[in-house]
Amino acid sequence: MKQGINFMGNTPDIFKLRRIIIAHFAKVENGVVVQVIVAEQDVIDSGIFGLVWVQTSYNTHGGQHPEGRPLRKNYAGIGYTYDSQRDAFIPPQPFPSWVMSEETCLWSSPVPYPTDVGTAENPKRYSWDEATLAWVEVEMV
């Protein structure tokens, strides 16, 4: 019968595992996100990838996080702005008429999205028309 090894409470260093904590980080140049990576905090702190990395949370959207730990309003994406005053990642403004919510750092149209979405058999979709500042129904193909 095979028996386990007993180190009598003294685990050799070779068996001691270091807890590895990884996170998402955004590389920010001139206030704009140019890259998002997954790395250990120690690697980011070492400066091997440069100095301007800001942690971002994959599960944060509009200042909400499923576990109640939102980080920087939104998950960073390439082309997003990092606003250090708000400590937030802000997506690009989709249209000039859209307004950003200070609470969520997300953009909203000046006219709410239509509530008439049709039926399961005959759904309706809409697209924003900046020229008329209105939602227009898009033909489903």
Q: Which residues does each predicted region cover?
A:
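Interaction-interface detector
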Residues: 2-141
